[in-house]
UniProtKB/Swiss-Prot annotation, chains A, B:
Gene3D superfamilies registered for this protein in UniProt: MoaB/Mog-like domain
Protein family: Belongs to the CinA family.
Highest taxon, organism lineage: Archaea
InterPro entries listed in its UniProt record: CinA, CinA_Arc, MoaB/Mog-like_dom_sf, MoaB/Mog_dom
Name the UniProt record assigns to this protein: Protein SSO0103
SUPFAM superfamilies in alphabetical order: Molybdenum cofactor biosynthesis proteins
Length: 272, 272
């Protein structure tokens, strides 16, 4: 059986870490991880793991350390950069890297300027956001106060972004535009087929054959009741150096799938 | 500084594993993890980690193995139990436990009955859903075909549920009602305050003091722009053996927080 690893070339793999108890208790749905996942995928990376941990220094440190040990090309975290007692990402990351946490002068200037222009005094809590691991580079946050933290370590681009979605997205884009060193030259393309009246288990043997034949990624997502009223979303995804080549491969796979669906009396839909 | 661990007594901690490339690429938001997190939290568990991994046997096995090594009381996974080539959770779990994957007769009977009553023939793909780690107990799935997988290992209740949300929720409830051995006697309570016109960084020193004073969990979630128009959601959460005791503590904390908010010219809102 063809492994996905072959297709996606795991040299360009990425990991995501989200920090915050609210995700673990289910209070907050982890949309930050989805956004980061989509963005990294669009750049040709394959996200191989997402880890959500509590606001505790040791948990954060171990999540970063374990991710670093798996040698991805990029690690992006979100959460834990704010001014409160439970914002501990900078400390956790420093511990994972084995360096000191120290006042980053550039970060402090960024923060100071934002408060000063609004005539708001700087406090210990506000100053806290300028503490970063030794050697880190602050990343501009145009949507809020806390700068992102960028570190290049063991050939891995490591970025910590704030947890507020708008700020996370902004810091992530600034990092991609100005700092990201490991750039995949892979293109990623995907296409979908929506089908009614075909059970996932009926289509399964065809999908298995096509995955083998084309060395491509096909996944069926059941969207309704398997037996009484089956609706399937079929995802066909590939990545490679030549966009045209992937396009052609996906088209061929779609053609064969549509043929199989016809045999199984499936009804093609335009959307879900 | 008071650690959350003290408050939540991590003897009752839990982990969640979700299996599926669609979560990693950001195609699907991980609402399954949120549901499982909320449900386990309501039972008095503290979810300490959520790990999302690819549909690969080795990745699934390592996620389970690492979770088992951290000695939680419960591990709940979702995804990867279906009939297709990329459904590999049973195999990954067997590998993590160091046991064989084998045809589970009870599971096979469950599956057979569902197809037979609808006069649908059994195929290799459909039979696949009956393969489970040696010693596993199938968990009834009243919303679909694939049964859940329950294993009691190293004093840990391990449950694998399907990835379709409706099926996951049903299998989870069947497991809680019939199989869950490690039952927390802790009650968990939480309350919220919504406030306008107070910056998170202004409230931070008060929150820090109250966390110390009451040994309770307080978290501020900024919902708008920190400086131009700050809106905060303040979460106050506690758990313990006596429901009344936690209630009183949360009320006292709320009282002191409202006092601090008044000092900071905050405006209390009824909701976000």
């Amino acid at each position: 059986m063809v492994s996905i690893v072959n297709i996606f070339m795991d040299y360009w793999f990425a990991e995501i870490i989200t920090i915050g108890n609210e995700v673990l208790s289910g209070k907050t749905v982890n949309t930050n991880a989805s956004h980061i996942g989509r963005r990294l995928t669009s750049l040709g990376f394959t996200v191989r793991r997402i880890t959500a941990v509590m606001d505790e220094v040791d948990e954060i440190a171990s999540a970063f350390r374990e991710a670093i040990d798996r040698k991805p090309r990029v690690i992006v975290s979100s959460g834990g950069l704010g001014p409160t007692w439970d914002d501990k990402t900078a400390e956790g990351l420093a511990k994972a890297l084995g360096v000191n946490l120290e006042l980053n002068k550039t970060a402090f200037d960024m923060i100071l300027e934002k408060y000063m222009t609004r005539k708001i005094p700087i406090t210990e809590e506000r100053k806290k956001m300028a503490y970063m691991p030794y050697g880190a580079i602050p990343v501009e946050n145009n949507e809020g106060i806390a700068p992102g933290i960028y570190v290049y370590h063991n050939n891995i681009d490591i970025l910590a972004t704030p947890g507020v979605p708008r700020e996370m997205e902004n810091v992530l884009e600034n990092f991609i535009n100005k700092m990201l060193r490991n750039r995949s030259n892979l293109k990623y393309l995907e296409d979908f087929i929506y089908v009614e009246n075909v059970m996932e288990s009926s289509l399964a043997p065809y999908v298995k054959e096509l995955v083998k034949k084309y060395d491509i990624y096909i996944k069926t997502h059941p969207k309704s009741y398997e037996m009484s009223h089956p609706i399937l979303e079929i995802q066909i995804a590939g990545s490679g150096k030549q966009e045209e080549e992937i396009k052609v491969k996906i088209e061929k796979v779609k053609f064969e799938l549509l043929d199989a669906i016809k045999k199984l009396n499936g009804i093609i839909r335009n959307s879900l």
